[in-house]
Amino acid sequence: MQTLSIQNLIIGFGKAGKTLAADLAQHGQDVILVEASDQMYGGTCINIGCIPSKKLLVEGQRRAACADSGDAVFSAAMQAKNGLIPKLRAANFAKLDNMEKVRVINARARFIDAQTVSITGAVGNAGEQGERQIRAERIFINTGSVPAVPPIPGVDGARVYDSTGILSLAERPKRMVIVGGGYIGLEFAFMYRAFGTEVTILDNLDEFLPREDRDIAGEMRRILEARGVKIQLGVKVERFDNTATETTVVTSGGSFAADAVLLATGRRANTQGLDLEKAGVRVDARGFIEVDDHLHATPRIWAMGDVAGSPQFTYISLDDYRIVRDELLGEGRRSRRDRAIFPTAVFTNPPLGHIGMTETAARKAGRNVKVSTLKAEAIPKAKVLGQTDGLLKAVVDAGSGEILGVTLLCAEAHEIINLFKMAIDNRVPAGYVRSQIFTHPTMAEALNDLFAPF
């Protein structure tokens, strides 16, 4: 069996892996990047996550406003999504494939030992088949995560989908049941409701969006229900009864018939078949690779992105790359400890942006806080956009004026929330935001009113 020797081996063509490969190559280092599927160049976000789902959201909202039929809107949105994703995937591949120091190999990888990986499949850009071994000085694992499928009877039915399959339906379902009331489920609820699908969300929790303050969660639920989405809390799914024409979700709280069922039940580490134990790589109780603050799984093996148990966002995977890059090519000062606070966005309609502490968390931590809220309907730009649903909230230390947290459920929240990453990192006081000059009419100028009480 032929053995290839390389300085850097990257397993997985995700955000961190592809960016690190290009950077190392630009610094004169040889890189082999192994990816199991040629449909995953660029990682989850580009192919089966953020980009296709957001494209469907945008197309659905835009076309629905034109009063087209639900089926026509759905078909046009799918065509737009299907036209975009292959272009992005090809661009990601070409960027690395055109680099002299990078070799991309389509194959499945498994560890032989801490420095050796066996690859099976198409082991070269020309597509030759076979099994080879790669011996590397350094190995980086960036294999991401995959949908977690609960062991429920009937879950293998043809009309039961995970978050990947639901992005590629040939026809619009008239009725959809979403199992799971978390953020992924909410995004798809808004998406398919915009297409005209009847949507029901089932969640085994008794509390809707338990991580959010009750006023924010209540407003989100109000918006969903006002648009016709049904929400059932505190129900346990017992089985899926599948027939040729529909799937019935049987729960502790009744039965729900659907043309499509979405499992929005979380994600698990994509490590199956890697034989991590042969390399001395340990995983935690949830199956994610255990790493230190510099993303080392072992002295010569790093893990980056979802597979390392990092928060499951593409921009966090990019930050993982920065940590590793700083160790290899910089001063080695960056670590996971540097990102205790970062913004998040849920692409509902309106979007939900958040950073820092909620009011509930701040009070539980013993902080003396002042809180301000502002209804989106009070914002002139929201009226211009015709998007007056939502609620804005700021949590501030009552003594120092330090901004502890901000939650924005309103139009453009996914953009505006990023301002508060810089504000909190630089300890900008609430009074500065209150008196800041913003353009008009914009959603951002509402921050003057939101922070006026401080």
Predicted regions mapped to residue ranges:
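Glycine-rich flavin
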Residues: 2-6, 16, 23-29, 33-172, ...
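Short hydrophobic core segments
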Residues: 9-11, 109, 133-144, 179, ...
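Flexible, glycine-rich terminal cap/loop adjacent to redox cofactors
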Residues: 9-39, 43-44, 51, 55-56, ...
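Glycine-rich Rossmann-fold phosphate-binding loop(s) that bind the pyrophosphate
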Residues: 12-15, 179-182, 306
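Short glycine/serine/threonine-rich phosphate/pyrophosphate-binding segments
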Residues: 16-20, 160, 185-188, 271
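Gly/Ala-rich phosphate-binding loop of Rossmann-like dinucleotide-binding domains
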Residues: 21, 25, 189, 193-194
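FAD-binding beta-loop-beta segment adjacent to the flavin cofactor pocket
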Residues: 147, 287-300, 381-393, 397
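FAD-site-proximal beta/loop scaffold in flavoenzymes
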Residues: 156-171, 255-331
